[in-house]
Amino acid sequence: MDLFNYFRRETTEVNIGAVPLGGPNSIRVQSMTNTSTQDTQACVEQAKRIVDAGGEYVRLTTQGIKEAENLMNINIGLRSQGYMVPLVADVHFNPKVADVAAQYAEKVRINPGNYVDAARTFKKLEYTDEEYAQEIQKIHDRFVPFLNICKKNHTAIRIGVNHGSLSDRIMSRYGDTPAGMVESCMEFLRICVEENFTDVVISIKASNTVVMVKTVRLLVDVMEKEGMAFPLHLGVTEAGDGEDGRIKSALGIGALLSDGLGDTCLLYTSPSPRDP
C-alpha cells in the first residue's frame, strides 16, 4: 500500500440489474428501507425517495417466504413508475427464502454464519477434522442449488459476514477473530469459484470499526493469494443513529476507501433513509 499515491483496487465487474458494480464503475451508493417488505406501497415510496436522493441500489429485509415473494410486486410497482433501481434482498437464517428471493431481486445477501450452520449456541465447541469437513460439505450441497437458481435468473449475490454471527463451527477453530470472519467468507467464495459463479459481492462487517477495517484488509490479502478479485461492499453494522452513527460509519468506510478498497457503500444511519 502506497500512503502517498491513491490506487483503487482492481476488481471484477458484477452485473446487478442495469447497474454494474466493481470493475471500472464508480463507487456505488445504496441504502436500506425500514418499512415492512410485505407493505408494497410503503416499500415502493421509500425506495423512490432513496433513488431520488442518489441511491443506486435499494436493500430490503427479507425475513420469510412472503417477504421474498412480495419483492416481485415491489419491483413491478417501481418499474411501472420508471424506477429501474436494482433491489437487494437481505436474507438471514433460511436458505429457502434466499432461493425464492433470487427469482425476484437483482441481488440476494446471505450470511455465512447462519446460512447452513446452526445459529451460535456454544453447545458444541470442538469439531474433529472429519466433522469439520462434513459441515463444509453440507454448505456445498446446499449452496450450489442456490447458485444455480441465481444463474438461471441472472441474480447476483452478496456474501455478507457479520462479526456477531459467526457459527459455532468457525468459533471452535478460529475464535471471535478477524481470521475467523475471513475464513467464514472464503468457504463460500471457494465454492463460487468452483461453480464458475462470478456475480459475487462480499462484505465483512463489525460494530467495532478497528475490527472491521483490519478484517477487510486481511480478506483482501487472502483473496489475492487465492487469485480472487471480488468487489467489496463496505458498511459498519450497528453503527447507531444520528451524528454518532455517521461518524462511526465515516471512520470505518473512509479508512478503507483511502486504501483504495471498496466498490459500494451502504449508508442507513437515520430514521428515514433520505434524512440527513
Where are the model-predicted features located?
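Active-site-adjacent loop and "lid" segments of alpha/beta metabolic enzymes
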Residues: 169-182, 230-259
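Conserved, mostly hydrophobic/aromatic
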Residues: 29, 90, 159, 202, ...
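N-terminal amphipathic alpha-helix/helix-capping segment at the start of soluble metabolic enzymes
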Residues: 1-30
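Alpha-helix-loop-beta-strand connector modules within alpha/beta enzyme cores
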Residues: 68-87, 141-149, 222-226
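Single conserved hydrophobic/aromatic residue that forms the stacking wall/gate
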Residues: 268-276
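Glycine-rich, proline-tolerant flexible connector loops at the mouths of alpha/beta enzymes
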Residues: 55-74, 114-123, 130-131, 203-207
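Active-site mouth loops of central-metabolism enzymes
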Residues: 27-42, 88-89, 171-180, 240-245
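Glycine-rich tight-turn/loop motif centered on a GG-T
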Residues: 106-142, 169-180
